[in-house]
Amino acid sequence: MQDLKTYLSTAPVLAISSFIFLAGLLIEINRFFPDALTFAFF
């Protein structure tokens, strides 16, 4: 179990998991608020 914790706390695993989280968050924001970038100019 300690080896699994050590593996999950390494930098590539943390980076990939954070990128997946951010990508999912952006997808969900764009699903509920489509074309939100065009509203920034008004």
From Swiss-Prot:
It holds the Pfam family PSI_PsaJ. InterPro entries: PSI_PsaJ, PSI_PsaJ_sf. It is found in: Plastid, Chloroplast thylakoid membrane. May help in the organization of the PsaE and PsaF subunits. It is a single-pass membrane protein. GO terms for biological process: photosynthesis. The chain crosses the membrane at residues 7-27. It comes from Picea glauca (White spruce). Its main location: plastid. Belongs to the PsaJ family. GO terms for cellular component: chloroplast thylakoid membrane; photosystem I. Keywords: Chloroplast, Membrane, Photosynthesis, Photosystem I, Plastid, Thylakoid, Transmembrane, Transmembrane helix. This is Photosystem I reaction center subunit IX.
